[in-house]
Amino acid sequence: MQDHQHVPIDIQTSKLLDWLVDRRHCNLKWQSLVLTIREKINTAIQDMPESQEIAQLLSGSYIHYFHCLRIVDLLKGTEASTKNIFGRYSSQRMKDWQEIISLYEKDNTYLVELSSLLVRNVNYEIPSLKKQIAKCQQLQQDYSRKEEEGQAGAAEMREQFYHSCKQYGITGDNVRRELLALVKDLPSQLAEIGAGAQSLGEAIDLYQACVEFVCDSPTEQVLPMLRYVQPKGNSTVYEWRTGTEPSVVERPQLEDPPEQVQEDEIDWGDFGLEAVSDSGNIISAETPGIDWGISLESESKDAGADKIDWGDNAVASEITVLETGTEAPEGVARGSDALTLLEYPETRNQFIDELMELEIFLSQRAVEMSEEADILSVSQFQLAPAILQGQTKEKMLSLVSTLQHLIGQLTSLDLQHLFMILASPRYVDRVTELLQQKLKQSQLLALKKDLMVEKQQEALQEQAALEPKLDLLLEKTRELQKLIEADISKRYNGRPVNLMGTSV
């Protein structure tokens, strides 16, 4: 039979207090006695001799029974002069700490207090610190991920901004001013396209001859605008409309970009409000161009012709006014008449339509010429004009390539943007706002990235502050465990004692 002296005593830490009470090692009402002891300790530590070791025992740690024993040992050296012939000390310091030790040893109060500290550390303090450290680590991972997302997002939005600027042909330093500056180069680009269209005379004559041959009767001239461009190039709308070159050309001026409003100023806008007079509180709201939602009607029926229509036709009315304002003396090109054929939308669309019409004809003719090996096709063109019979498929394809190049230039995205800028200054504002929005989003994401870096450092600093506390708490908890196991072992004739479930 195994000697029971060597059988270990295993005690679950969570049940340690109940175990001590059940085996009558301590009193059930030990907490009230511990409160009394704590009060006496708080009073006693107010009057202590100067000693480095005592100062270390009293600094920042929970003073328990074994600390008190060490303090008494130290006081035996500092208070040796107060010892009488009976071996007792007359020093009040020594008396106070000896009384504290006596109270601790009554009903083994020190043991149950140490056990209470151990249970609290194991069940609450240590898990709480570990949870806080784990939270800091998780926050660092989250902030690191968000930092990478913010950096990638900022780079992507910045790349989109510069890519869009590249599409518009600007650098992005001053979007609005650069967009308006692009329009200044538009006439020279359109002049080059007009010069390229002047080489289409042969293709136009070929188309005209084919139409006359197929219809078997003289017809009106085809492609009037392309035919007009041959000698005149990209002239003004006035010259195209009237047939005479204007003596004066008054081109519409583009609006200069407004001054940027300072961040610390409020832009109240210009509502055209008159100042309030000192004698009254009347404010004039007679602002042209603003629809106040008020229907103004004259009392007289005869005034109906002068009534202003604020309805959905306001835009059409505005266009009518603008066109009316272009009336100018003879020989003066003003307003839309001052624009070139390729600048004015109506004539530009007609120009593109005629280019496409000519391209389709030549493409179809090239297909027909590749299939004219049969006798029927040859016989059909025996009576055709010489200009039709003298063409080759390669010549047709060459002319088609020239036309496609001109159409591609006029319908390119760059020129479409420039045409919209020329037609509507509001388009410049929309494009500017869109591009600036991308840049602002990039800046906001960059700020978010910096904020995530800052928060990551804060979480790292918090973790660095918690880890030493956890290490110290684990060390003290292991110390408490050894003290409790040794004390209980003494009570059972040296049997080994194991406190289970501490995980420290």
Curated annotation (Swiss-Prot):
May be phosphorylated by CDK5. A motif (Shuffled ATG8-binding motif 2) lies at residues 290-293. GO terms for cellular component: centrosome; cytoplasm; endomembrane system; endoplasmic reticulum membrane; microtubule; nucleus; protein-containing complex. Keywords: Cytoplasm, Cytoskeleton, Endoplasmic reticulum, Isopeptide bond, Membrane, Nucleus, Phosphoprotein, Ubl conjugation, Ubl conjugation pathway. There is a cross-link at K448 (Glycyl lysine isopeptide (Lys-Gly) (interchain with G-Cter in SUMO2)). A motif (Shuffled ATG8-binding motif 1) lies at residues 266-269. InterPro entries: CDK5RAP3. Its main location: endoplasmic reticulum. It is found in: Endoplasmic reticulum membrane; Cytoplasm; Nucleus; Cytoplasm, Cytoskeleton, Microtubule organizing center, Centrosome. GO terms for biological process: apoptotic nuclear changes; cell population proliferation; definitive erythrocyte differentiation; endoplasmic reticulum unfolded protein response; liver development; mitotic G2 DNA damage checkpoint signaling; mitotic G2/M transition checkpoint; negative regulation of MAP kinase activity. A motif (Shuffled ATG8-binding motif 3) lies at residues 308-311. Residues 353-368 are annotated as: RPL10a-binding domain (RBD). Residues 268-504 are annotated as: Required for interaction with UFL1 and mediates interaction with CHEK1. Pfam families: CDK5RAP3. Expressed in vascular endothelium. Up-regulated in failing heart. Highly expressed in the ventricular section in subacute and chronic ischemic heart failure. Substrate adapter component of the UFM1 ribosome E3 ligase (UREL) complex, composed of UFL1, DDRGK1 and CDK5RAP3. Interaction with UFL1 anchors CDK5RAP3 in the cytoplasm, preventing its translocation to the nucleus which allows expression of the CCND1 cyclin and progression of cells through the G1/S transition. Interacts with ATG8 family proteins MAP1LC3A, MAP1LC3B, GABARAP, GABARAPL1 and GABARAPL2. Interacts with CDK5R1; competes with CDK5RAP1 and CDK5RAP2. Interacts with RELA. Interacts with CHEK1; may negatively regulate CHEK1 and thereby stimulate entry into mitosis. Belongs to the CDK5RAP3 family. Substrate adapter of E3 ligase complexes mediating ufmylation, the covalent attachment of the ubiquitin-like modifier UFM1 to substrate proteins, and which is involved in various processes, such as ribosome recycling and reticulophagy (also called ER-phagy). As part of the UREL complex, plays a key role in ribosome recycling by promoting mono-ufmylation of RPL26/uL24 subunit of the 60S ribosome. The shuffled ATG8-binding motifs mediate interaction with both ATG8 family protein and UFM1. The RPL10a-binding domain (RBD) anchors the UREL complex onto the ribosome via association with RPL10a/ul1. This is CDK5 regulatory subunit-associated protein 3. It comes from Rattus norvegicus. The gene is Cdk5rap3.
